[in-house]
Amino acid sequence: MIKYYDRKTQTYQIEKVAGEKMIRWTYSSPVGMRLLETVVKKRMCSSFYGWYLDRRISRRKIHPFVCKFDLDLSIAEKNLKDFSSFNDFFYRKLKPSARSIDPCQDSLISLGDGKLLAYEDINLDCLVQVKGLTYSLKELIKDPETASKYKRGTCLILRLCPTDYHRFHFIDSGICEPSHRIKGSYYSVNPVALQKVAKLFCENKREWSIFHSDHFGDILTIEVGATFVGSIIQSYTPHQPVARGDEKGYFKFGGSTVLLFFEENKIKIDPDIVEQTKLGYETYILFGEKIGVRHKGR
């Protein structure tokens, strides 16, 4: 059971997890862990399933998925019958009216929909995966010089489960450098898996880039793939100016995670999100929602 905080209702909710029984069996049983290490985490497994989900025959999975998780497709650009495959449905675009971006330029907005954790004044060599398991930023991006810029900064971790909107966006105007790709495995990023696999983010396939934002400094953005995420698609053009809210990219099928690292004294996260993180709960947020502010005097 995964419990998260809904800041709109100020209540705790239970997450509906796609494939929950299989995830728990895989990461909690000797046979499941053996299957995970020999088959599931491999690129071939995710690539094959991704190939299937790109095929027209996979359309038959869409309606049952929508019904099971009570998804609102009235906010999607396409109608249900117009999706060419399950992946086409999975990384669907939303109507412009579906999400509103906080109008204040000093507001730090969410890059997408998902469950958020926020850590301030971070120790780069002891980043929290879950309680008792840590990793370092140097291990994560394999670039010590870049990592050192974020000493005592802020780390945001946005987890996108399979039922979420799977496109991610720029949180400010600015210019983004090219993305660096790091090969890796395909472990699930579900909290169950995070408790079982040490340094999971450092093990999985991932991409990172530096976004030179106009109001929040140089932001390190890291997209982490997961089980059955065959592709992390970067839809932006490097070195070209972008506007606040412009799309940066999207994930194909699977749960995924985006991490943002901010330099010291650049932002202040909203107190409710920080408090829930300290209590061990993720906070559910939507793209464009205010999650913090620019640090005064910066």
From Swiss-Prot:
Protein's GO biological process: phosphatidylethanolamine biosynthetic process
Q: In which pathway does it act?
A: Phospholipid metabolism; phosphatidylethanolamine biosynthesis; phosphatidylethanolamine from CDP-diacylglycerol: step 2/2
How many cofactors are bound and how? Answer: Binds 1 pyruvoyl group covalently per subunit.
Q: How does it sit in the membrane?
A: Peripheral membrane protein
What does the record give as EC number? 4.1.1.65
Q: Which reaction does it catalyse?
A: a 1,2-diacyl-sn-glycero-3-phospho-L-serine + H(+) = a 1,2-diacyl-sn-glycero-3-phosphoethanolamine + CO2
The gene designation is psd
Residues modified as Pyruvic acid (Ser): 256
Q: Which family does it belong to?
A: Belongs to the phosphatidylserine decarboxylase family. PSD-B subfamily. Prokaryotic type II sub-subfamily.
Cell location: Cell membrane
Q: What is this protein called?
A: Phosphatidylserine decarboxylase proenzyme
What's the PTM story here? Is synthesized initially as an inactive proenzyme. Formation of the active enzyme involves a self-maturation process in which the active site pyruvoyl group is generated from an internal serine residue via an autocatalytic post-translational modification. Two non-identical subunits are generated from the proenzyme in this reaction, and the pyruvate is formed at the N-terminus of the alpha chain, which is derived from the carboxyl end of the proenzyme.
Q: What is the lineage of its organism?
A: Bacteria, Bacillati, Bacillota, Clostridia, Eubacteriales
Q: Which NCBIfam families match?
A: PRK00723.1, PS_decarb
Residue positions of the active site: 113, 169, 256
- Purpose: Catalyzes the formation of phosphatidylethanolamine (PtdEtn) from phosphatidylserine (PtdSer).
Q: Where is this site: Cleavage (non-hydrolytic)?
A: 255-256
Top EC class of this enzyme? lyase
Pfam families attached to this UniProt entry? PS_Dcarbxylase
**One Gene Ontology molecular-function label:** phosphatidylserine decarboxylase activity
Q: Kindly give the PANTHER family that the UniProt entry links to this protein.
A: PHOSPHATIDYLSERINE DECARBOXYLASE, PHOSPHATIDYLSERINE DECARBOXYLASE PROENZYME 2
Q: Which cofactor does it need?
A: pyruvate
Subunit-level organization: Heterodimer of a large membrane-associated beta subunit and a small pyruvoyl-containing alpha subunit.
Main location per the UniProt record? membrane
